[in-house]
Amino acid sequence: MAAAALRAPTQVTVSPETHMDLTKGCVTFEDIAIYFSQDEWGLLDEAQRLLYLEVMLENFALVASLGCGHGTEDEETPSDQNVSVGVSQSKAGSSTQKTQSCEMCVPVLKDILHLADLPGQKPYLVGECTNHHQHQKHHSAKKSLKRDMDRASYVKCCLFCMSLKPFRKWEVGKDLPAMLRLLRSLVFPGGKKPGTITECGEDIRSQKSHYKSGECGKASRHKHTPVYHPRVYTGKKLYECSKCGKAFRGKYSLVQHQRVHTGERPWECNECGKFFSQTSHLNDHRRIHTGERPYECSECGKLFRQNSSLVDHQKIHTGARPYECSQCGKSFSQKATLVKHQRVHTGERPYKCGECGNSFSQSAILNQHRRIHTGAKPYECGQCGKSFSQKATLIKHQRVHTGERPYKCGDCGKSFSQSSILIQHRRIHTGARPYECGQCGKSFSQKSGLIQHQVVHTGERPYECNKCGNSFSQCSSLIHHQKCHNT
């Protein structure tokens, strides 16, 4: 039924604002395509590769729907307000001219779809599949010609159907796999893929290339196929951001970057309504709702939602600390931790509270501070029901129930439930007294000792007996006094 639907003529309406005059030179697929070298492709995780496939198919479909790209057939010149492009199935008796122009779409799609079949391997640039196409014609020209002509027709129909779909509503992982299967069935009928053993027993990928680039020597296997050396080899950045001057190899990368300046977040989570600037960020976020953790540490078996989190975690096992502070020489396993640390030296506090105006060096600290104003205590103890504003406070509290004392003194072996208590205890062994009185110069090992001492200078007596009304400067003195009433 799906195949029958694709054979039916499809009408595409293009608004005057988005349509480009075909007589003045269209933007071709190569103008907006993004290609990766083998090393670059190897750095992408699964979600990023899936995003790449989505973007390539989306761009190719949109270019094809405007009648641009590789010279699609049945083009009509634009009229007053709208342009209607009719696509119908090619007949066996179509002209050679149209067959060749339609046939150009097939190798491009083959390159894109090859990535779906070979994750993590070198992506094939345009020309790999074209050469395979030419090699097959060497054995059966007429049979191949008719098959490719019909195939290109179906691909075109499919692309026009794709152009009707609102691509901003695409859900990576849902719509895309179905579209890939549909395109693959049209481009690779019978499940056959390029780069396989052909009728003469020769592996196409082992053939030598004949058409080379004069700049870098990169070869193309079809004389009509451009070699994309500027973006892959020289590292030349073609698209520059007008706001900050940062340059990118692909136009789509620039569009993504510009959302940093515009604040645009077109991708919405249908679970919680949160918006994101990139589909890859949305995919990472969705795992919060699904609980999916597809990335596993081979050392300890710990699971992570994002590949980047796994990479950061693995530095615990390797001990790698590649990010060093230029001020004090301290090194960190994560760049984000270094950035936070550097604010100690710069004094930068970029996160400001809208209620009281206090500023903070980290967003997490600001979030904790805001709970003072809201009174929110989201962390509840499962044992006694007591709630806390910070997760760290809940963890400390839970040790009251469990009796856990994870902090051990290396000098005497005594253990403590909190690191701060261990730090105070160690001063017994070291003799450190970091808290000094500004009035008399007397120093103390604990801040509480200094506070108690300062009452001597101020004359303050905050501790009052509820029996006789006498007041005292220290709590211990009040407790000693109350024993008189008890006797």
From Swiss-Prot:
Gene Ontology terms: biological process: regulation of transcription by RNA polymerase II
Keyword Cell cycle among UniProt keywords: no
Localisation: Nucleus
C2H2-type ZnF: 239-261, 267-289, 295-317, 323-345, 351-373, 379-401, 407-429, 435-457, 463-485
One CC-aspect GO term: nucleus
Tissue specificity remark: Expressed at high levels in gastric glands, and at low levels in colon and small intestine. Silenced through promoter methylation in gastric glands with intestinal metaplasia.
Signal peptide: none
Its job: May be a transcriptional repressor.
Protein name: Zinc finger protein interacting with ribonucleoprotein K
